[in-house]
Protein backbone atom coordinates (compact mmCIF):
# COMPACT_ATOMS: atom_id res chain seq x y z
CA UNK A 1 0.00 0.00 0.00
CA UNK A 2 1.37 3.39 -0.97
CA UNK A 3 0.20 6.50 0.83
CA UNK A 4 0.69 9.93 -0.68
CA UNK A 5 1.65 12.96 1.35
CA UNK A 6 -1.77 14.57 1.26
CA UNK A 7 -3.93 12.09 3.15
CA UNK A 8 -3.16 9.90 6.16
CA UNK A 9 -5.96 8.05 7.90
CA UNK A 10 -5.61 6.77 11.44
CA UNK A 11 -7.62 3.79 12.57
CA UNK A 12 -8.00 4.69 16.26
CA UNK A 13 -9.94 7.94 15.98
CA UNK A 14 -7.07 10.25 16.88
CA UNK A 15 -6.40 13.17 14.57
CA UNK A 16 -3.21 12.93 12.53
CA UNK A 17 -0.60 15.67 12.93
CA UNK A 18 1.54 14.26 10.14
CA UNK A 19 2.04 15.59 6.64
CA UNK A 20 -0.31 18.55 7.02
CA UNK A 21 2.13 19.83 9.65
CA UNK A 22 5.34 18.63 8.02
CA UNK A 23 8.31 20.91 7.57
CA UNK A 24 9.32 24.04 9.46
CA UNK A 25 6.82 25.47 11.93
CA UNK A 26 4.69 22.32 11.93
CA UNK A 27 2.04 23.29 14.47
CA UNK A 28 1.83 21.22 17.62
CA UNK A 29 4.53 18.65 16.95
CA UNK A 30 8.24 18.19 17.40
CA UNK A 31 10.74 18.12 14.54
CA UNK A 32 11.42 14.56 13.38
CA UNK A 33 14.76 13.21 12.20
CA UNK A 34 15.05 9.78 10.59
CA UNK A 35 18.14 7.61 11.04
CA UNK A 36 18.56 4.91 8.38
CA UNK A 37 21.26 2.65 6.99
CA UNK A 38 22.36 -0.96 6.56
CA UNK A 39 22.30 -3.59 9.31
CA UNK A 40 25.21 -3.15 11.71
CA UNK A 41 26.26 0.30 10.53
CA UNK A 42 25.74 1.83 13.97
CA UNK A 43 22.28 3.42 13.75
CA UNK A 44 21.18 2.46 17.26
CA UNK A 45 24.53 3.44 18.73
CA UNK A 46 24.22 6.83 17.02
CA UNK A 47 20.68 7.31 18.34
CA UNK A 48 21.96 6.47 21.83
CA UNK A 49 24.81 8.97 21.45
CA UNK A 50 22.43 11.72 20.33
CA UNK A 51 20.13 11.03 23.26
CA UNK A 52 23.00 11.20 25.73
CA UNK A 53 24.35 14.41 24.21
CA UNK A 54 21.04 16.25 23.86
CA UNK A 55 18.65 14.97 26.51
CA UNK A 56 19.90 17.34 29.20
CA UNK A 57 18.60 20.30 27.19
CA UNK A 58 15.91 18.79 24.92
CA UNK A 59 12.84 16.61 25.46
CA UNK A 60 13.53 13.70 23.12
CA UNK A 61 11.45 10.73 22.01
CA UNK A 62 12.58 7.73 19.96
CA UNK A 63 10.74 5.30 17.69
CA UNK A 64 12.69 2.25 16.51
CA UNK A 65 11.87 -0.21 13.73
CA UNK A 66 12.66 -3.93 13.63
CA UNK A 67 11.06 -6.60 11.48
CA UNK A 68 10.05 -9.13 14.14
CA UNK A 69 11.45 -7.88 17.47
CA UNK A 70 11.84 -4.79 19.66
CA UNK A 71 15.59 -5.37 19.94
CA UNK A 72 16.76 -1.82 19.26
CA UNK A 73 14.22 -0.21 21.60
CA UNK A 74 15.15 -2.75 24.29
CA UNK A 75 18.83 -1.86 23.87
CA UNK A 76 18.13 1.86 24.28
CA UNK A 77 16.00 1.25 27.37
CA UNK A 78 18.68 -0.93 28.96
CA UNK A 79 21.27 1.73 28.18
CA UNK A 80 19.17 4.27 30.07
CA UNK A 81 19.55 7.00 27.47
CA UNK A 82 15.97 8.25 28.00
CA UNK A 83 12.96 7.64 30.19
CA UNK A 84 11.73 4.23 28.96
CA UNK A 85 8.29 5.71 28.23
CA UNK A 86 9.88 7.92 25.58
CA UNK A 87 11.22 4.94 23.63
CA UNK A 88 8.72 3.10 21.42
CA UNK A 89 9.11 0.22 18.97
CA UNK A 90 7.44 -0.64 15.68
CA UNK A 91 7.58 -4.28 14.53
CA UNK A 92 7.25 -3.83 10.78
CA UNK A 93 6.76 -7.46 9.73
CA UNK A 94 8.06 -6.43 6.31
CA UNK A 95 11.02 -4.87 4.53
CA UNK A 96 12.21 -1.92 6.64
CA UNK A 97 11.95 0.62 3.82
CA UNK A 98 8.25 -0.17 3.39
CA UNK A 99 7.42 1.10 6.87
CA UNK A 100 9.41 4.33 6.56
CA UNK A 101 8.62 5.22 2.95
CA UNK A 102 5.84 3.30 1.21
CA UNK A 103 3.29 2.86 4.01
CA UNK A 104 4.29 5.00 6.96
CA UNK A 105 1.04 4.50 8.89
CA UNK A 106 2.50 2.39 11.73
CA UNK A 107 5.39 4.78 12.30
CA UNK A 108 3.27 7.89 12.00
CA UNK A 109 0.75 6.51 14.48
CA UNK A 110 3.54 5.56 16.91
CA UNK A 111 5.15 9.00 16.73
CA UNK A 112 1.81 10.70 17.32
CA UNK A 113 0.97 8.38 20.20
CA UNK A 114 4.37 9.04 21.74
CA UNK A 115 3.80 12.79 21.71
CA UNK A 116 0.23 12.43 22.95
CA UNK A 117 1.30 10.19 25.84
CA UNK A 118 4.45 11.98 26.99
CA UNK A 119 3.55 15.61 26.37
CA UNK A 120 5.36 18.15 24.19
CA UNK A 121 8.71 17.00 22.82
CA UNK A 122 11.53 18.98 21.24
CA UNK A 123 12.79 16.19 18.96
CA UNK A 124 11.66 12.76 17.78
CA UNK A 125 14.25 10.37 16.35
CA UNK A 126 12.86 7.63 14.08
CA UNK A 127 15.31 4.77 13.53
CA UNK A 128 14.73 2.55 10.52
CA UNK A 129 15.34 -1.16 10.57
CA UNK A 130 18.55 -2.17 8.84
CA UNK A 131 18.20 -1.98 5.06
CA UNK A 132 20.26 -1.48 1.91
CA UNK A 133 21.55 1.64 0.16
CA UNK A 134 18.17 2.38 -1.40
CA UNK A 135 16.39 2.98 1.92
CA UNK A 136 14.99 6.48 2.37
CA UNK A 137 12.30 8.01 4.57
CA UNK A 138 9.10 9.62 3.38
CA UNK A 139 9.07 13.33 4.17
CA UNK A 140 5.50 12.74 5.28
CA UNK A 141 7.06 11.04 8.32
CA UNK A 142 10.24 13.00 8.99
CA UNK A 143 11.70 16.45 8.38
CA UNK A 144 15.35 15.48 7.95
CA UNK A 145 17.12 12.17 7.41
CA UNK A 146 20.53 10.83 8.37
CA UNK A 147 21.97 7.85 6.53
CA UNK A 148 24.63 5.78 8.30
CA UNK A 149 27.16 3.51 6.60
CA UNK A 150 30.36 2.08 8.05
CA UNK A 151 33.84 1.40 6.81
CA UNK A 152 33.57 -2.36 7.40
CA UNK A 153 31.71 -2.60 4.10
CA UNK A 154 34.83 -1.33 2.33
CA UNK A 155 35.78 2.02 0.85
CA UNK A 156 33.63 1.29 -2.21
CA UNK A 157 30.35 1.98 -0.36
CA UNK A 158 30.03 5.74 -1.11
CA UNK A 159 30.98 5.06 -4.74
CA UNK A 160 28.14 2.55 -5.07
CA UNK A 161 25.70 5.36 -4.32
CA UNK A 162 22.01 4.69 -3.90
CA UNK A 163 19.35 7.10 -2.63
CA UNK A 164 20.45 6.78 0.99
CA UNK A 165 24.01 7.78 0.15
CA UNK A 166 23.24 10.47 -2.41
CA UNK A 167 20.00 11.99 -1.17
CA UNK A 168 20.03 11.97 2.64
CA UNK A 169 20.36 15.28 4.43
CA UNK A 170 23.44 14.01 6.27
CA UNK A 171 25.66 11.03 5.42
CA UNK A 172 27.51 9.54 8.39
CA UNK A 173 30.45 7.25 7.63
CA UNK A 174 30.89 5.40 10.91
CA UNK A 175 33.47 3.14 12.58
CA UNK A 176 36.47 4.96 11.16
CA UNK A 177 38.61 3.28 13.83
CA UNK A 178 38.16 0.01 11.92
CA UNK A 179 39.55 1.37 8.64
CA UNK A 180 43.11 0.03 9.12
CA UNK A 181 41.75 -3.38 10.07
CA UNK A 182 39.61 -3.80 6.95
CA UNK A 183 41.88 -1.98 4.50
CA UNK A 184 39.45 0.89 3.88
CA UNK A 185 40.93 4.14 2.58
CA UNK A 186 39.13 7.05 4.25
CA UNK A 187 40.49 9.51 1.68
CA UNK A 188 38.88 7.46 -1.09
CA UNK A 189 35.61 7.38 0.84
CA UNK A 190 35.76 11.14 1.37
CA UNK A 191 36.42 11.77 -2.32
CA UNK A 192 33.65 9.46 -3.50
CA UNK A 193 31.13 10.70 -0.94
CA UNK A 194 31.74 14.30 -1.95
CA UNK A 195 31.43 13.40 -5.63
CA UNK A 196 28.15 11.60 -5.00
CA UNK A 197 26.62 14.26 -2.74
CA UNK A 198 27.93 17.59 -3.92
CA UNK A 199 27.35 20.17 -1.19
CA UNK A 200 25.34 17.83 1.05
CA UNK A 201 27.27 17.28 4.30
CA UNK A 202 29.27 14.17 5.16
CA UNK A 203 30.56 13.32 8.63
CA UNK A 204 33.17 10.68 9.44
CA UNK A 205 32.89 9.39 12.98
CA UNK A 206 33.92 6.71 15.41
CA UNK A 207 31.57 6.29 18.35
CA UNK A 208 34.39 4.46 20.11
CA UNK A 209 36.66 7.49 19.89
CA UNK A 210 33.86 10.06 20.27
CA UNK A 211 30.88 8.61 22.17
CA UNK A 212 29.06 11.96 21.94
CA UNK A 213 29.10 12.03 18.12
CA UNK A 214 29.95 15.72 18.39
CA UNK A 215 29.73 16.60 14.69
CA UNK A 216 26.42 14.80 14.23
CA UNK A 217 25.07 16.41 17.39
CA UNK A 218 26.07 19.84 16.07
CA UNK A 219 24.30 19.13 12.78
CA UNK A 220 21.14 18.05 14.62
CA UNK A 221 21.15 21.26 16.68
CA UNK A 222 21.47 23.31 13.50
CA UNK A 223 18.47 21.52 11.98
CA UNK A 224 16.41 22.09 15.11
CA UNK A 225 17.18 25.79 14.95
CA UNK A 226 15.56 25.77 11.48
CA UNK A 227 12.69 23.42 12.20
CA UNK A 228 11.57 24.36 15.68
CA UNK A 229 7.82 25.06 15.78
CA UNK A 230 8.38 26.77 19.12
CA UNK A 231 9.94 29.92 17.80
CA UNK A 232 13.55 28.90 17.30
CA UNK A 233 14.33 28.22 20.95
CA UNK A 234 17.32 26.00 20.12
CA UNK A 235 20.88 27.15 20.63
CA UNK A 236 22.81 26.41 17.45
CA UNK A 237 25.94 28.22 18.65
CA UNK A 238 27.83 24.93 18.78
CA UNK A 239 26.78 23.94 15.27
CA UNK A 240 29.44 25.83 13.32
CA UNK A 241 30.85 22.62 11.84
CA UNK A 242 27.44 21.53 10.58
CA UNK A 243 27.64 23.80 7.54
CA UNK A 244 30.90 22.22 6.39
CA UNK A 245 30.54 19.66 3.58
CA UNK A 246 32.99 17.19 5.14
CA UNK A 247 34.10 16.56 8.73
CA UNK A 248 36.72 13.95 9.52
CA UNK A 249 36.96 12.29 12.92
From Swiss-Prot:
This is Urease accessory protein UreG. SUPFAM superfamilies: P-loop containing nucleoside triphosphate hydrolases. Belongs to the SIMIBI class G3E GTPase family. UreG subfamily. Transmembrane segments: none annotated. It comes from Frankia casuarinae (strain DSM 45818 / CECT 9043 / HFP020203 / CcI3). Homodimer. UreD, UreF and UreG form a complex that acts as a GTP-hydrolysis-dependent molecular chaperone, activating the urease apoprotein by helping to assemble the nickel containing metallocenter of UreC. The UreE protein probably delivers the nickel. Residues 1-13 have a biased composition (Basic and acidic residues). It comes from the Bacteria. GO terms for molecular function: GTP binding; GTPase activity; nickel cation binding. One of its GO terms (biological process) is urea catabolic process. Residues 238-249 have a biased composition (Polar residues). It is found in: Cytoplasm. GTP binds at residues 37-44. Residues 18-33 have a biased composition (Low complexity). Keywords: Chaperone, Cytoplasm, GTP-binding, Nickel insertion, Nucleotide-binding. Residues 1-34, 229-249 are annotated as: Disordered. Coiled coil: none annotated. The keyword Cytoplasm applies. The keyword Amino-acid biosynthesis does not apply. Its main location: cytoplasm.
Amino acid sequence: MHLGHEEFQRTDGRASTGPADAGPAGAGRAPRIGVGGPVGSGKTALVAALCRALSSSLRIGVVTNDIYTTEDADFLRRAGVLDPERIRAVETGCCPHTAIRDDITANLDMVEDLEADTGPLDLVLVESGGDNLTATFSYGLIDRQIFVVDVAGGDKVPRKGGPGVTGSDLLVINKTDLAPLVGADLDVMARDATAARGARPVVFTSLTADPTAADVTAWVRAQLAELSPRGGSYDASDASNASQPLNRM
